[in-house]
């Protein structure tokens, strides 16, 4: 309640009278609220009750952009403008695993390929904690709380969003180099030089993240976002012309290899973007890729949908970071943000008026890009756990898809080792304390 304008007004009217402030905060009066069925509604309730009601809504922001021009084709700032004026497209939130794009892009810059391997294993390091102002031990974990111990191609690690591999790559490539690459691709927000940046610990906004992914979709060429292309006065005289400049932010070879990584999110076994096939599977004349992202405590859920001529990004989260889902069953990017992008892409690609957005990334143009750099055996674990908590599609079983998105086989919970089933049950128990809304 202390964050609301009415509290400051009451504080000025009743200085040193906390009982009076509490009385008026709990006194019923006419309040405007939001309802999904009716939109804006009026009710006679107290300010405290209105906060308890409104704060529970999950919010959404969405952007669609053309990679070749930077033209913003869709911009949705929130679920209802009358109730929430703040534009969530510009909100600063942790990008989670969507930031791994820059880690892997820099890895490709430095000569690695999607078929190079790294091991998914325990890693620990000493880092400086700014809040505690001391050196602490940081042990990043995977979303499912375990490590396979296996060596896997980078294309599999990216598709499955393996945190341990991303952190290790961050140390190998250098965080400063990753920051430089992210800035060249379109990230303008300040990024902290810390190992956790590889997992998306620094805040960014939706617009710049979408713009950066467009750089990869556009073969490494970066365009600034364009909202207005041209303005004329009443006499038809041009008074403004939108920017049409572009620059090669990352080499073509790097962009091509990262495109393969993004498509692998839908094609690799256990890829966290596989459920996008349910929305765009009918449009085989177009290449699709994606990357999910989820921040700590499921406070932010992201999905980046990528095609050669259209890039979309959705964010879902609470008004405050303390408002979030308790588990990954609903809180992951694949569960909340991916369907938003999926329905939008489906509506675009089924419309004959938008045939210009169909197309494939194409074969490599450079002779030094060989097939063995990006076409290699996928990683198949010996036994698979429920990937609901790893930004994956989840469900009763795990669907394994081939390179064209067709099911190969299904691994059911019965295929899990008994010890792993027990671990899953333990992980599924919520341990988070319930939120006290009165403290807002």
Name each model-derived stretch:
Residues 132-140, 172-211, 220, 224-225:
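Mid-domain, small-residue-enriched loop/turn segments at the edges of structured enzyme/sensor domains
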Residues 112-176, 222, 234-259, 263:
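Conserved catalytic neighborhood of penicillin-recognizing serine enzymes
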Residues 370-440:
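Low-complexity, Gly/Ser/Thr/Pro-rich intrinsically disordered linker/tail segments
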Residues 72-73, 80, 85, 95-108, ...:
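Extended, hydrophobic alpha-helical segments in both membrane/secreted and soluble proteins
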Residues 71-72, 238, 407:
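Hydrophobic "anchor" residues
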Residues 69-70, 92-120, 126, 157, ...:
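Active-site SXXK
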Residues 1-66, 75-76, 81-88, 99, ...:
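A penicillin-recognizing enzyme superfamily signal
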